[in-house]
Amino acid sequence: MLEQDIQKILYSENDIIRKTKKLGEQLTKDYQEKNPLMIGVLKGSVPFMAELMKHIDTHVEIDFMVVSSYHGGTSSSGEVKILKDVDTNIEGRDIIIVEDIIDTGRTLKYLRDMFKYRKANTIKIATLFDKPEGRVVKIEADYVCYNIPNEFIVGFGLDYAENYRNLPYVGVLKEEVYSK
């Protein structure tokens, strides 16, 4: 039923798992004996973070934040709001911010600056998708599974109006669906 709204599938579930496994192996090497704190940006990061954690073979703690700059639409409002902050004290910690997609970069720049202010030891960004064409602020991810074109994608945590997150793959949403 949801598939009728998808223009094309970009990445299958198996494609995503393969890339995520490779990233997990890299994080294992980079954070051996460091006990990093992975902070997932809800809601979109949940499938990616859950898959990623399965492939990290070192100690890691997790926490979550709810941050929004979209407020239900298809384009960023430009205003970043923290709706739920982390519960963990991050001072002196090695932080890995886990995000489903980097588009404008505003949210991640805001979080990185906030964690610097809170005296995190290191701050790295891991994302499933990076959309450099959408960037309006200067920020780069440290770990990227896929660079993608400037298309509206959904699935594997990515949504349109809180729908399509449950698709096991990532596809391009038909324009007529979000331009109504």
Curated annotation (Swiss-Prot):
> What GO CC annotations are associated with the protein?
cytosol
Q: Which Pfam families match?
A: Pribosyltran
Instruction: Tell me which residues this entry annotates as catalytic.
Output: 103
Q: Which reaction does it catalyse?
A: IMP + diphosphate = hypoxanthine + 5-phospho-alpha-D-ribose 1-diphosphate; GMP + diphosphate = guanine + 5-phospho-alpha-D-ribose 1-diphosphate
The organism's superkingdom is given as: Bacteria
Any S-S bridges, and between which cysteines?
none
Binding residue positions for Mg(2+)? 99-100
NCBIfam families reported in the protein's UniProt record: HGPRTase
Can you name this protein? Hypoxanthine-guanine phosphoribosyltransferase
Q: Which species does the entry assign this protein to?
A: Streptococcus pyogenes serotype M6 (strain ATCC BAA-946 / MGAS10394)
Q: Which gene encodes it?
A: hpt
